[in-house]
Curated annotation (Swiss-Prot):
The modification Phosphothreonine is found at residue 9. Signal peptide: none annotated. This is ISWI one complex protein 4. Residues 259-294 have a biased composition (Basic residues). Present with 5820 molecules/cell in log phase SD medium. GO terms for biological process: chromatin remodeling; regulation of DNA-templated transcription; response to heat; sister chromatid cohesion. SMART domains: PWWP. CDD domains: PWWP_ScIOC4-like. The keyword Transcription regulation applies. Pfam families: PWWP. Residues 72-84, 181-193, 241-252 have a biased composition (Acidic residues). It comes from Saccharomyces cerevisiae (strain ATCC 204508 / S288c). Residues 456-475 have a biased composition (Basic and acidic residues). The modification Phosphoserine is found at residues 2, 65, 73, 242.
Amino acid sequence: MSEAIFQPTDIVLAKVKGFSAWPAMIIPNELIPDNILKTKPVSVHKGKSGSDKKANEDIDADMESEARDREQSEEEEDIEDFGESEANPEKFIIYTPVLKFRKNDTLKSTYCVKFFCDDSYIWVKPMDMKILTSEDCRKWLSGKQRKNKKLIPAYEMAMRGKNGIDIWEFVEYGSYGKPDEEEYVEEEEEENEPEKKAIRPTRSSSRQRQKRASETEKSEGGNSNKRKRVTRSTRQQAIDASEEEEEEEEEKVQEAVRKRPQRTKTKKVVVSKTKPNPKTKAKKEKPKPPKPIKYHFEDDEDWSIVGLGPQDLSIEKTMDPIAKKLSQKKNLEKHVEIKLDLEDKLAGINKLLCDVLCSAINQAVSIKDDFEIILDELQIALDTRGSRNEFITIFQSNNSLLLNFRILFNLRKRELNKWDLWDRFQDIFKHIYSYQFIPDTEDWQLEQNMEIEEMDREKPSFSEDVKEEESKVGA
């Protein structure tokens, strides 16, 4: 709904959660009942953020502005009583020569409204209401949409406009106005009739008793078929009689107090003075203790400390994000599973490197495709290093991988440069160990004599086999 500077006595359409939008009137601060003022919502913000401070400042400003409005209205009333000045129509809504309401200069956080044909008060935010004109009411009543039967009299009353509604009578007696005075007084007198019969004689003068008796005879004689209408004089007589009875009761109480001994008086005074003191002290001596922060076991943030009682959780503020993530059981289980898979994959890469390097030693020419397969496997393994690179330590702690890299770079440097694979292997090495591999100063070469010796060892055995076969044939 629209936000505007609403003024007292404005007719609005207010929306409350769980109910339909209802026509209501904004009640001036001067006419709001005390019990409704006590229910005005004041939100308490415990946080220290800027938005919370701003909200608190807005609430304080609203309270100060309301207090200022009341003081100014009282000052204006005092000035008007003495005849020094008249109310300014720019600052006041002059309802009658006696009744006026101060206008709102700024938008307030809440407004007190009273619903038509419901007579209930509520504090509404400006965003939950909008101005309701007579034309809007006429359109709603003449519309063909389905209507709530309780809303129809409320819209009919709102259609009269704020000038057609007596604000004081609306606040005092409700939507249906002041009740019939004659019926109200007659009921009151009927209720008081048995009380008059039961009243015992008082110490009133003889003239007053004769006067009351003559008046009662006149009232009973004139009301044969229908009860006589109660006038102002009869009501005044009833009030005078009640006042006389109250005065006599007060005299009796004073006489009884005089007859009592002095001790009882002093005791009563002392007791009455000492009673309220401990109550006020008790209220001051009972501050609310701060609520302790307890560990909620159902959160399962750190399942290893379950059963150890309340813990100091302030360490979580400075905890490493990876450690905080692994403190949860499900994340730790997933981490261990990925770690085992990565270790198995590195073991397969090491085996593949050993096979390629050993086969290259026995062969004259290495196969380029084998090294490209190793590069692809290493790249796939590095892709599972984790979002925060937490699995890189598994590569760094694998000594077999480091040894195979050293053999590869020193023994197959010429071939890797020829196939343009040297830089790719160096990039992977730098990604794992944070620096590039520096080959040895002396080039690694295969010992040729080792192959010759192996051939020589095989030849004698072959000749011996031939000789044995020849001897067998000769025999």
